[in-house]
């Protein structure tokens, strides 16, 4: 019983500190999007990884909780555009199926069409076993070729890293 109490205490301590950790890497905009995806008012976020894994920095992947129940995961990444970078959010369910992909910050004058819901819906319901190929299962956008290829590569790299992590000891949440 004491071990369970200690575990509960440590989890609550981690949850209470997560606001500080989370705000360093994710914006209020991302937080609002995550709350909308899960139809909740105030999600809690816990850093999922204790250390970096190949392809994923530990401070970019979060487990999403509502009232102590794990709802899914959020990944905040950065990808290259023509002359700068853009930030994006990928929200997963507990089985790592994509529930939402969103471009959070796009810093270029051209190519911002990759932020459209219509284009990003191509990633919905995909899992770490799926792969993406520009002009095969990912549509091109005139004037946004570099950003489209960059987002496609970023999603591929994320899925490959998640698949590797799942296959090397991380338990599946199903």
Residue ranges and their predicted role:
Residues 7-18:
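Bacterial N-terminal signal peptides
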């Amino acid at each position: 019983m004491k071990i369970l109490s200690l575990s509960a205490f440590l989890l609550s301590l981690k949850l209470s500190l997560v606001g500080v950790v989370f705000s360093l890497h994710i914006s209020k905009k991302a937080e609002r999007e995550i709350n909308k995806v899960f139809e909740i008012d105030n999600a809690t976020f816990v850093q999922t990884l204790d250390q970096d894994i190949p392809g994923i920095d530990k401070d970019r992947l979060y487990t999403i909780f509502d009232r102590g129940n794990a709802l899914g995961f959020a990944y905040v990444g950065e990808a290259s555009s023509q002359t700068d970078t853009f930030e994006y959010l990928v929200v997963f369910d507990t089985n790592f199926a994509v529930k939402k992909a969103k471009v959070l910050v796009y810093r270029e004058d051209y190519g911002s069409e990759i932020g459209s819901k219509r284009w990003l819906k191509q990633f919905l319901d995909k899992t770490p076993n799926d792969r993406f190929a520009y002009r095969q299962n990912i549509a091109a956008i005139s004037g946004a070729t570099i950003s489209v290829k960059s987002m496609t590569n970023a999603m591929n790299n994320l899925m490959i890293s998640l698949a590797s992590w799942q296959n090397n000891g991380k338990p599946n949440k199903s």
